[in-house]
A protein has these predicted regions:
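Short, intrinsically disordered low-complexity segments
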Residues: 2, 23, 53, 67-70, ...
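N-terminal extension/subdomain marker
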Residues: 2-59
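Short alpha-helix boundary/capping and kink motifs at helix termini
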Residues: 6-14, 18, 65-122, 135
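A short, basic-hydrophobic beta/loop patch
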Residues: 27, 109-153
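Extended aliphatic helical segments
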Residues: 31, 39, 60, 72, ...
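Short, structured coil/loop segments at alpha-helix boundaries
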Residues: 53-58, 88-94, 147
Length: 153
């Protein structure tokens, strides 16, 4: 137990000093990401706010309903990023660092929300969490809900 506390303290110190490579190496060895069993309620509102920038209101409502009724499943971090045509954010991104601090403290992260659109998949909520997971282990499983079959405009 003391060994984990020392590793966590070293990781936090490395992170504070900006030595992100050392922090990442330490995290890979000592901290596995822990996930909530289901999506936090506020994440649905965040997903709908993001989707309102990309879709019309009817589609946003449809996506929200599909996301709320979808079951939690898992996909590898690299596959989520590849399907959404996104690159992972670096560990020094403020949102990724916030989630890394949560992981170091043992806090569970909320599953991700993904929608499939005619132009491909998109991460409606949880891009920072997927990026963190990818940076720690690109092939690690990330829990998510997927909404598909949205009405076309």
């Amino acid at each position: 137990m003391a060994k984990n506390k020392k590793a966590e303290a070293k990781a936090a110190k490395d992170l504070k000093q900006g030595d992100l490579k050392a922090a990442r190496d330490t995290q890979e060895a000592t901290v596995g990401l822990k996930w909530l069993g289901d999506v936090a309620e506020h994440d649905f509102a965040a997903a709908e706010a993001y989707l309102s920038l990309r879709l019309d209101p009817t589609q946003v409502d449809d996506a929200g309903k599909h996301l709320r009724s979808a079951k939690v499943t898992t996909r590898r971090a690299n596959d989520i990023l590849r399907a959404s045509n996104r690159d992972p954010l670096p560990l020094d991104d403020p949102g990724v660092m916030r989630d890394l601090r949560k992981a170091i403290s043992g806090e569970k992260l909320s599953p991700v929300l993904v929608v499939t659109l005619p132009q491909g998949a998109d991460i409606a909520d949880g891009y920072h969490r997927v990026s963190l997971a990818y940076n720690l282990n690109p092939f690690g499983d990330v829990p998510l809900r997927i909404a598909s079959e949205l009405r076309k405009k």
